[in-house]
Amino acid sequence: MTTQTFRSDFLRTLHERGYIHQCSDLERLDAKAAEGPITAYIGFDATASSLHAGHLLSIMMLRTLQRTGHNPIALMGGGTTKIGDPSGKDEARKMLTDQQIEDNIASIRKVFARFLDFGAGAKMENNASWLDELKYIPLLREVGPHFTINRMLTFDSVKLRLEREQPLTFLEFNYMILQAYDFVELNARHGCILQMGGSDQWGNIVNGMELGRRMRGADLFALTTPLLTTSSGAKMGKTAGGAVWLDADLLSPYEYWQYWRNAGDADVERFLKLFTELPLDEIARLAALEGQEINHAKEVLATEATALLHGREAAEKAKETSRATFADGALAVDLPTVEVPRATLEAGLPVAKAFVDAGLVASTSEARRQIKGGGLKVNDVTVTDEKAVIDLGALTPEGVVKLSLGKKKHVLLKPV
């Protein structure tokens, strides 16, 4: 479908801004959304106390859904988190207590409240409210006939573990069944007809769609987004310093602003479409900037993305702090520079070793102590992961990586 043929504002907006990867029936879903408000959901694990930038694509889809007159549901996996999604994992996830999961959900709700209006159609649900109440034999009789072991073994989350001869527990094997059941339950409770998610979740989403059709005769839809990486191949939401958290207690608005300011030139237009609400003609103007002027577009990206999460005042303050710190190219000119072989960054330089090589700490053990105390930063983002590596994706627009110990000691790594 082209932009002109969409009848619904919701899908037209998603299409124009590059959110759509795959849909079970785009034309019929568009017709439904054009007729009146629809209800759609995206599921989120409760494995951490915050979401990170890798979740933003899903959050922005829910926000777009609400802004175009529909009803979003943010489904927290309070029940499924007790099992753990085996997708993309080589081993079983760490088991969390019920209290840890509840605390995580309470914290994550604050993030959603920045993007969704829970008083105007948006809802947050917790699948523990129905999964915890299921009885085993009735579940097997009601849901079991609709799943074949043959098909379940073809899913990547299962197949990859078995091919690698890594254990897959019966607990994890049940994850896809319970995840599919969520769609059935949300359709029954809220008339929900659409599940959205990343393209890696396509099989799980289609499972739920088919289960709803078989159990309830429901007319359901699946829609996925592209799996997003930066132009350097890095995973969204990850930096050399660790995860880019959406919680100001874990990552300051200034550090969040810096994450977006450090976007690669090739990513600017795409990120402006996906992670800001600027008009498309303004985005096209910014994307056309060249040379040093592209840095203005990156500042706009950083400020608009930060304003959505932390508010306009915090975003403007972060921008001014950055300008005061790096006015007139001070970053590239005035700081001591250590050269590293480009091949070293291509292979991935352990962050602790990088600080040793830069002369900022005496040993990797000291670097690890500093990381635990929040004393090290890469490109002005606090390092939280001792095992993080610095690669070419960490290069700033100036072609360097900035390492900081505390507030006053800075060194630039420059690939040669």
Curated annotation (Swiss-Prot):
A biological process (GO) of this protein is: tyrosyl-tRNA aminoacylation
Motif 'HIGH' region mapped to chain: 46-55
The protein's Enzyme Commission number: 6.1.1.1
Main location as per UniProt: cytoplasm
The answer, when asked if Zinc is one of the entry's keywords, is no
> Which residues hold L-tyrosine?
Y41, Y175, Q179
What PROSITE patterns does the database record attribute to this sequence? S4
| GO cellular component terms given for this protein | cytosol
Q: Where in the cell is it found?
A: Cytoplasm
The record lists the catalysed reaction(s) as:
tRNA(Tyr) + L-tyrosine + ATP = L-tyrosyl-tRNA(Tyr) + AMP + diphosphate + H(+)
Q: What CDD domains does its record include?
A: S4, TyrRS_core
Q: Which residues bind ATP?
A: K238
Every copy of the S4 RNA-binding domain together lies at: 349-416
| Key words of the record | Aminoacyl-tRNA synthetase, ATP-binding, Cytoplasm, Ligase, Nucleotide-binding, Protein biosynthesis, RNA-binding
UniProt motif ('KMSKS' region) ranges: 235-239
User: Which molecular-function annotation in GO is an example for this chain?
Assistant: tyrosine-tRNA ligase activity
Assembly mode: Homodimer.
PANTHER family reported in the protein's UniProt record:
TYROSINE--TRNA LIGASE, MITOCHONDRIAL (PTHR11766:SF0), TYROSYL-TRNA SYNTHETASE (PTHR11766)
Q: Which family does it belong to?
A: Belongs to the class-I aminoacyl-tRNA synthetase family. TyrS type 1 subfamily.
Its biological purpose: Catalyzes the attachment of tyrosine to tRNA(Tyr) in a two-step reaction: tyrosine is first activated by ATP to form Tyr-AMP and then transferred to the acceptor end of tRNA(Tyr).
Protein name from the UniProt record = Tyrosine--tRNA ligase
* Taxonomic path: Bacteria, Pseudomonadati, Pseudomonadota, Alphaproteobacteria, Hyphomicrobiales
